[in-house]
Amino acid sequence: MKRTREKVKEKVMAALELPSAPAEELAAALREVKLHRLYADPDIAGLLRKRDEVRDVRELLDDADIFVALDRSFTDRITAIGARFDSRSDELYHTMLVHEQQLRSTCGLPTYEHFNTSIVVEFLDEGHYKNPLDFGASVDYAMSYFSLTLRSFLEAGERMSVHYDSAKFDAACLHLPLSGEWAIFHERRSIWEHGQARGTRHENVAVFDASGSELLSAFRVSLSRLRGVRQGESFNPMTHPAVAGSTRKLPIDGFRSNDEVKSAYMTTQQFYSEDLREEVRGARLCEWIRAYTVVKEIAKQHIASHPLIGQPATLLLHKTADFFLAEFVAAGIPVKSAGQILRRFTFNASSKDILDAPLIPFNGELVLVPTAAMLIEPAFSLESLLKSIRSGKDEPNHELQFIGPGFEKLTRRVLADAGIVARKVKHKNRDCDVAFVLEDDVLFLCECKGRFQTSDFRSYVELEAELGRDAAQQHRKTCDYFESHLAHVRDRLGLAPTWVPSRVMRVILTSAKLGRVRFNEDFYVIDENMFYAFFARKKLSMRPLSSRRRTFVHDPRLDGPITVDAFIAYMDDPPSISRTRMLLEERELHFELEGRMITFKDVECYGELLKEHKESAVWTFPGTTVHHYS
């Protein structure tokens, strides 16, 4: 990353040093300045100030000054809190206590009642919340900040004896107001850096408006769809046979609980895998699920065994690495796999949060924040954990290596179940993942891109860019080749030697949930949810969280035979996106900076959980599920 940034810096400096750089070249340089946060670099900032007679440069500098000052104000607040502790280890210990106390209070669990400070959890956009899921999304913001704070403590590398001190607990509580603000600031800065918010200033007020950004709206819709599906699955009544039928091989020693059954089911869906014994990062999928399950069980047992918290230290669980290793092995995980899992579960500088890596190294032991561990959903934590692990120089991209083949296979099965012949077409170095024909003479050539779900704005921007640029370029060459060499398509699909398509439709299909339909020149870019729902004739439905009863929404495009026109109409306006877009609302978030009011205007999706007869319910958008095809 540093090498890339240095290369970009050299290129940008060369462009800015030109006395009369072309407008397009200057605009490109300014985009790189924002994307790589080079505006905070003294060398780049100095060159920009020499060109401040240019309007775009001046506006960038004015905006950047605000973000740099806001970042500094947050850093100063964090530093001021840290000054009240004897060491970083001291601060880490008391911050973990505060976080556990906060989570217990939120979840209605036993707390230590003798703290001087009462913990109140508030978020900047609470006025918009419609249900607990909206609150939960903001808790994710807080968890991000807490994990960011942890990483800074761990990097200090200190080991010393620490003990509870009420004044230090009070000081650690000051991190809480920062939690949501810090994470929200980071996201708003990222939105601006990607050119999706324009700043305006008037006297002591600065406004950054991203409410009209289609890209931001798409990200919000994508994330809302993801939250809705995950929330819906977590309440989905499920039994052992339901999952046993969805996998070709059972996990180690069967299932320990219904919770593990759900985790196994959701893992098969997220990883497009029919075999939970597939290996990833040194352990099988079922072993990762079992290890997360064991950590949750240890956390639950710790909380249950302490109905009254007599001492603050009891809030946390301190154990050696050997303890957790032994627990994993006792649960049926081979020693070698258990060692790999323990290494990945240990929180470090690259960890995203403690839901993925729940074991925090502290003074030679591993500390578990029990209530946070209870919130772990193994399927989602494993996906997030894998995203945080960067592949080595000679290692294949895990998403491509692991998700891709299963995703392609299931896409072809969706079509086969609809009575449509679908095949992979290969010749020499050309490879079309899925080819099929509708109405006898309309050929569809599909490129499948297996990707993890995106949960932050930058990742979503990169996803859309990859699909619309890199994937399109690759698929264009593939389509051009096979359209010129139809014999290979005829052979794989069993078509007559003289068969010629009346037209060819090019489709890029991704496993990640999108927030809008993209039509890139001659390509449709859609996600598997839209594809599966159409060909499986699955209509949008709403299900109360407490039952299996569903209310279906009529969709004439899903009635009658499968036609080309109906499929195109569905791709143009999929209900999974159009319905979610109805939840978009504009909002304003405010920060104060040295007597100035900084306002961020954007959009957010609220209310994935709907109210029906006073009963919480969730929209159910059909999506490819492995158990349908086993």
Label for each model-derived stretch:
Residues 436-455:
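Active-site beta-strand-loop-beta-strand hairpin of nuclease catalytic cores
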Residues 408-430:
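A short acidic/basic microdomain associated with nuclease active sites
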Residues 419, 426, 438, 450, ...:
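Short, flexible loop/turn elements at secondary-structure junctions
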Residues 421-422, 443, 504:
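Hydrophobic anchor at the start of a short beta-strand
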Residues 429-437:
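Catalytic metal-binding acidic patch
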Residues 1-401, 409, 417, 462, ...:
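Acidic, metal-dependent phosphodiester-chemistry machinery of nucleic-acid enzymes
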Residues 451-485:
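Mg2+/Mn2+-dependent nuclease catalytic core
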